[in-house]
Amino acid sequence: IEAAKSSNNCAVPPFVGDLPIAENKEVLSIWKDYKSGEDCSNQRRETQQVIDDLPDEVRAMVFGRLPSFLNGASTDVKKMFRAIMYNRTLNYDLKKQELSKLAEEILSKKQLAEF
């Protein structure tokens, strides 16, 4: 959203498809009546509020930061989690399911407790 503020392009954010279903619908609703060329500061502010209200782990998944439970993980383990997190063909619910499955298979007990 910050990058969008520095440009004159106003539109539904490109990450909207990566959001959980409820937040996806909320952001689409925010932008539904927007007309190209109009001021979009209200839409940007409301969208930012939706993002700010996301739990940390969801925000990390949507915007690409690795969650803290992976801080001590090997490079290979981090790569496996990144492959799921950055997979644009999976929606949020499928990513969550795949990440949970992977976590059960490869994380240590300590990491799994933090997961």
From Swiss-Prot:
It comes from the Eukaryota. Antibodies against this antigen can recognize a human retinal pigment epithelium antigen explaining in part the retinal damage caused in onchocerciasis. This is OV39 antigen. The gene is OV39.
